[in-house]
């Protein structure tokens, strides 16, 4: 499993380490991918970091979890690289792939991405959004979900799934992942 963080975050923030620890009991090795300069992200640098961590490591059992700006970054990577064509799961939290009016400093980064949605292949694609996310409006996540031919799972939450709004753990996400690992139907 690979966890991709977002803007102004690090590998130690939010629920990332908690999820990695939880997955050990399922014999899933988890890497939280370090992305450089998160306060002033550069697409080439982030793409290089993802490439370094994921190249030649993806297979039919791979799961990728991405949060916020990490979502469009990993989708950009997966759509253009010759990577394993059908990973097990893609879990996208507060994802978007369009400029956000409240974060114009990210417009250049986002506009440089060239996600080719027809090249995104996973056995399970799950998008999750908070119904009152002050950072990424749920409508942006809904538009992303449409492009991925999936529906957004809407959770009642007044935040961006960050530690500062109470997300040190993320049981709903863990349960969705483990349901897939156990070949059970998820709550979705």
Feature annotation, model-predicted:
Residues 6, 35-38, 90-100:
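Active-site nucleophile loop of the alpha/beta-hydrolase fold
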Residues 28-31, 146-162:
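Catalytic histidine neighborhood in serine/cysteine hydrolases
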Residues 134-140:
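Conserved alpha/beta-hydrolase "acid-adjacent" motif
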